[in-house]
C-alpha cells in the first residue's frame, strides 16, 4: 500500500482544495437583445447563438 513520504502542509492542502470551491456563474450581455445569458449558451428568448437562428419557437 502506498504511504506518503511527508506530511502534506496546510498550505499545499489548501491549494489542492481551492479547485473544489463553488464559483459564481458568469454572464455575458447579448449583443442583439441586451439580455444576460451564460457564455457559450444560446439565448432562449430569441433562439440566437453567435448571430445565427438556432432555435425556432413554436406558436402556442
From Swiss-Prot:
Give the span(s) annotated as Disordered: 1-60
Q: Which GO biological-process labels does this protein carry?
A: translation
The entry's family comment says: Belongs to the bacterial ribosomal protein bL32 family.
Tell me the GO molecular function terms.
structural constituent of ribosome
Compositional bias, Basic and acidic residues, is annotated for: 17-44
The residue ranges flagged as biased composition, category Basic residues, are: 1-16
Q: The organism's lineage? A: Bacteria, Pseudomonadati, Pseudomonadota, Alphaproteobacteria, Hyphomicrobiales
Q: Which NCBIfam families does the annotation name?
A: rpmF_bact
Keyword check for Ribosomal protein, yes or no. yes
Q: What is this protein called?
A: Large ribosomal subunit protein bL32
